[in-house]
């Protein structure tokens, strides 16, 4: 069962898939085509209220208003980077806050969404886990992040649309699986936002390997990324406490099951921490771990964005990163050093939210 997670009793209509919206409409005495009209208003015309749906009856609009809200998020802070990255801080109906990031890529507009308010995974280098999980983010609230970013461009008369989505914001997506899957089905719907499945990536730390197997059977063509960050259990446990319950042996058994079932590539995210996990010896361990799986593997080396609360960690030097990369390439591993975005704003995941919460507490003191 999903926990009671908002003070607003009406859910966001964005949380319904098209089939669920049709089912709701029929149950409420409306024809199927009326639900299709609502869907078109939501995702093609992208209206901001039910009253703008001009081909619906007043009675049907009243039904919609009684049952749903449209967009449950309120924009609190917007930070724009010199490189075009935009970071948003949104407030939810129960006054908790989440982050969303827009990144301009050579291939289009990519949005990084948040799936939980806070995080309990306990990664020692990450800003997201500084503030523990308060609740899950509903499917409607996740979709709303995309809609508000798109609104940002629509209002400016810019002919640009969100083309890619990465589920890599605050929280562990597979710890909010039901809402995650509804969100994915909504944004992937060909009659709506029509964001291609292969343009969507979901990242997990692997805290529940069984969820990776379940994801394989849900049979979406969505990309899977694994937050790996270390090639052995001892080092990974020191960085990610979830390794105690999900050691690499269990994690890779699930990953192997996923690739055998789907024949889809897995991306391994590896954050580069100076003096912790960035030596050539550790690079060789990573290569040995991935080598037999290399046909369906890709390693993403990520420059670390320092976090004030985690002063122990510093980003690897460019020289050490290059040496690490070279070891992987010499072993035939598919890899890349990730392009940085938003380095002149609160770039690390969770940083902006943490800073705003501290500011709010200071005002109340």
Curated annotation (Swiss-Prot):
GO CC terms: cytoplasm
Listed cofactors: [4Fe-4S] cluster
GO molecular function, one term: metal ion binding
UniProt-listed Pfam families: Radical_SAM (PF04055), RlmN_N (PF21016)
Key words, A-Z: 4Fe-4S, Cytoplasm, Disulfide bond, Iron, Iron-sulfur, Metal-binding, Methyltransferase, rRNA processing, S-adenosyl-L-methionine, Transferase, tRNA processing
Top EC group: transferase
Keyword rRNA-binding on entry: no
Main subcellular location: cytoplasm
Localization: Cytoplasm
Function: Specifically methylates position 2 of adenine 2503 in 23S rRNA and position 2 of adenine 37 in tRNAs.
Misc note: Reaction proceeds by a ping-pong mechanism involving intermediate methylation of a conserved cysteine residue.
Name of the protein in its database record: Probable dual-specificity RNA methyltransferase RlmN
Annotated organism of origin: Lactococcus lactis subsp. cremoris (strain MG1363)
